[in-house]
């Protein structure tokens, strides 16, 4: 599993360099639900990950919801807009933002509203966790929970989010 994570980071890093972008955070999804119905096994089978990526010119933040399993590659990707800070404590940060996205699998373009909750590890040997809730204009609600596999730097991550508030 760890080898797969490194491979994913290598592939996406290469893609980001080609597009003049850099990673801010990567979340491995360990739990998922669609409109209240748990579908965790689907996300695990497809190796769902969430990526926060910054463009090299520092003008845009991108949000990717991607399947990484070989021969199953598909994603929804787009820009983050209108970030609002809801909570900011040492143990927890909560943000909401608009996400203008396009799906690779059906070319649909739309807007969704995202809440990002980050629960920081209380000790240095535990991983921080994220809860991501995505709601679209048709009231579809997606909930993803998982471990933050990669942070470029937690302070930089928060700074970049807050810069576009």
Region locations from a protein language model:
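Tryptophan-anchored aromatic micro-motifs
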Residues: 19-42
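Short, hydrophobic/aromatic-rich segments at coil-to-beta transitions
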Residues: 20-26, 58-62, 89-102, 126-131
